Design a protein with these regions (language model features):
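Extended extracellular/luminal ectodomain segments enriched in beta-structured repeat modules
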Residues: 69-76, 122
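Short proline/glycine-enriched turn/loop motifs at strand-loop junctions of beta-rich domains
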Residues: 71, 81-86, 134-135
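Exposed aromatic-hydrophobic patches
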Residues: 65, 111-117
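Sec-dependent bacterial lipoprotein signal peptides
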Residues: 1-23
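Edge beta-strands of jelly-roll/beta-sandwich modules across compartments, strongly enriched
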Residues: 128-146
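Transition segment at domain starts
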Residues: 25-68, 102
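Short, surface-exposed beta-strand/strand-loop-strand elements in extracellular ectodomains
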Residues: 84-101, 140-145
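A glycine-anchored, Pro-Gly-centered beta-turn/N-cap motif
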Residues: 109, 121-125
């Protein structure tokens, strides 16, 4: 009986550890987690390959959403047309580990980014856009890759 109790205890502990490993699991795919951006973010593509457009008129704030990534990496593409301000994308894997952090500043001569995140844990990821004094428009797309 002692071994059965010990085994049951280990199973319960294992299940608790496994379910606590997904920091963003409580959110549905493409569900908005935070939106303090005073401009506009329009999500035009959802599912496993989210994408959309954003506009601002000197606006600032954060826009983040949950994204179901079945792979270990993500490909991010985004571009801006803006003389001022900046756009920063941060990707966190299901455990909350930052796997990509990229910023483009308006008027810097660099207006687009295309790259791959470092490896992370598959599951529900968090996609964060931080827009600062953003005056213009832009678009983004994200795809899961191995």
């Amino acid at each position: 009986m002692k071994n059965v109790t010990k085994g049951l205890f280990m199973v319960i502990i294992g299940m608790a550890v496994m379910t606590s490993c997904s920091k963003y699991k409580k959110y549905d795919n493409n569900e908005v987690i935070e939106n303090t951006f005073t401009g506009n973010v329009a999500v035009s593509s959802t599912g496993s390959d989210p994408g959309g457009d954003f506009t601002g008129n000197g606006d600032s704030g954060t826009y983040s959403f949950a994204w179901e990534n079945s792979k270990t990496k993500a490909e991010l593409n985004f571009d801006i047309t803006s003389p001022t301000g900046s756009v920063q994308f941060i990707l966190n894997d299901r455990k909350g580990t930052e796997v990509l952090n990229q910023t483009i500043s308006g008027g810097s001569g660099v207006d687009s980014y295309s790259g791959v995140s470092s490896g992370g844990k598959p599951g529900t990821w968090k996609v964060t856009m931080i827009l600062t004094d953003f005056n213009g428009d832009g678009s983004y797309s994200i795809s899961p890759i191995d």
